[in-house]
């Protein structure tokens, strides 16, 4: 079953300073992984796919 990425990413990004950017990247990662870690930051252990996606510079892609 697919999770509600909009809802999960709104929660994940609720405290982000770059809110629109956070939502964009969270959305991409959620679509790929069907998972968003709990809380607004960290907790990536529960979502290894999300934690391991990298951007073109080799940094973390997912907020």
Swiss-Prot record:
Transferase as a keyword?
no
Q: Check the record and name the InterPro entries matching this protein.
A: GASA
UniProt name for this protein: Cypmaclein
User: What species was this sequence derived from?
Assistant: Cryptomeria japonica (Japanese cedar)
Tissue occurrence: Expressed in pollen (at protein level).
One short Pfam name that applies is GASA
- Family membership, please give it: Belongs to the GASA family.
Give yes or no: UniProt keyword Transmembrane helix. Answer: no
Entry keywords, A to Z: Allergen
């Amino acid at each position: 079953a697919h999770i509600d990425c909009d809802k999960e990413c709104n929660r994940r990004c609720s405290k982000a300073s770059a809110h629109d950017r956070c939502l964009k990247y969270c959305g991409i990662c959620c679509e790929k992984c069907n998972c968003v870690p709990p809380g607004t930051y960290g907790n990536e252990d529960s979502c290894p796919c999300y934690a391991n996606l990298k951007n073109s510079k080799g940094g973390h892609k997912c907020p």
